Amino acid sequence: MVGTSSLDISMSGSSSSDAEQWEKQTKSVHIDNSDVNSLILDYLVIQGDEEAAKTFAEEAQITDYYIPPYVKERLEICELIKSGSINSAICKLNELEPEILDTNSELLFELLRLRLLELIREVVEEKDTSDLAVERCLNFAHENLAPLAPSNQKFLNSLELTMSLLCFPPSSYSPALKNVLNYSQRERVANLANVSILKSQGLSNESRLLSLVNFERWCEKEAQRNSIEVQKFVPKASIK
């Protein structure tokens, strides 16, 4: 858990007076440990790690916390997607949220596309280029993905790129095609499923901790884009 913390600031700035003012301002900001613990607990719940959330809450002595229902089921669905068991994930998803795939076309398309990628992976990695193996991929794409693609240009482009995997030998794949077949696609779709389930349940779909991290990155990029030199600081906290 997060216990007593100290903040050491190291800076680089345009002038000594600016640096001193910045250090004075940062040291005047009080960060309560309970707020930090709340951010961590919120992150664990959003990520679906119920056991870790409960353990952390107990160690941090947080009593007034809320863990939404079906966290384990949500985590199980995400883990199935990450392992490539797309059919099982879809079945579990339909059991948990029966209407989600009817109302969320992006999630439906991405899950079906990932299933197609798993079929293509069998052809590519096992070097099974038989007519039967390729036909299985083509039939799946025709029956499940082709009806969705015309309604969305992004879907159409994605499907065309995916089908290109069957048109070239793996040794000649471009970086874009290699990325399509990368296992990181599973992680990406699992994250999409996690967010979609949370939205469907009326819950927050991004942890406050990640929001702060993303905001910090955005500020850094904006400063760089506008050629603004920002004073850097490195927090050092003692964790107990």
From Swiss-Prot:
The record's Pfam families line, in alphabetical order, gives: CTLH (PF10607), LisH (PF08513)
Protein localization: Nucleus; Cytoplasm
Write the record's keywords in alphabetical order, separated by commas. Cytoplasm, Nucleus
The record's section on InterPro entries has: CRA_dom (IPR013144), CTLH/CRA (IPR024964), CTLH_C (IPR006595), LisH (IPR006594), Ubq-SigPath_Reg (IPR050618)
Q: What is the organism lineage in this UniProt record?
A: Eukaryota, Fungi, Dikarya, Ascomycota, Taphrinomycotina
Query: What GO CC annotations are associated with the protein?
Result: cytoplasm; cytosol; GID complex; nucleus
* Listed GO biological process terms: negative regulation of gluconeogenesis; proteasome-mediated ubiquitin-dependent protein catabolic process
- Where is each CTLH domain found? 70-127
What does the similarity note say?
Belongs to the GID8 family.
The reply to whether Transcription figures as a keyword in the UniProt entry is no
Organism of derivation: Schizosaccharomyces pombe (strain 972 / ATCC 24843)
How does this protein assemble? Identified in the GID/CTLH complex. In the absence of stress, the complex exists as an inactive anticipatory complex (GID(Ant)), composed of Gid1, the E3 ubiquitin-ligase Gid2, Gid5, Gid8, and the RING-like subunit Gid9, awaiting a substrate receptor to form the active E3 ligase complex. When cells are shifted to glucose-containing medium, the substrate receptor Gid4 is induced and becomes part of the complex, named GID(SR4). Additionally, Gid7 transforms the GID(SR4) E3 ligase core into a higher-order supramolecular assembly (Chelator-GID(SR4)).
Query: Which function does this protein serve?
Result: Component of the GID E3 ligase complex recruiting N termini and catalyzing ubiquitination of proteins targeted for degradation. GID E3 is regulated through assembly with interchangeable N-degron-binding substrate receptors induced by distinct environmental perturbations. Required for the adaptation to the presence of glucose in the growth medium; mediates in association with the substrate receptor VID24/GID4 the degradation of enzymes involved in gluconeogenesis when cells are shifted to glucose-containing medium.
The UniProt entry lists the main location of this chain as nucleus
Q: What is this protein called?
A: GID complex subunit 8
Whether Repressor counts among this entry's keywords is no
- SMART domains given for it? CRA, CTLH, LisH
Database matches in PROSITE patterns:
CTLH, LISH
| Domain LisH, first and last residues per copy | 32-64
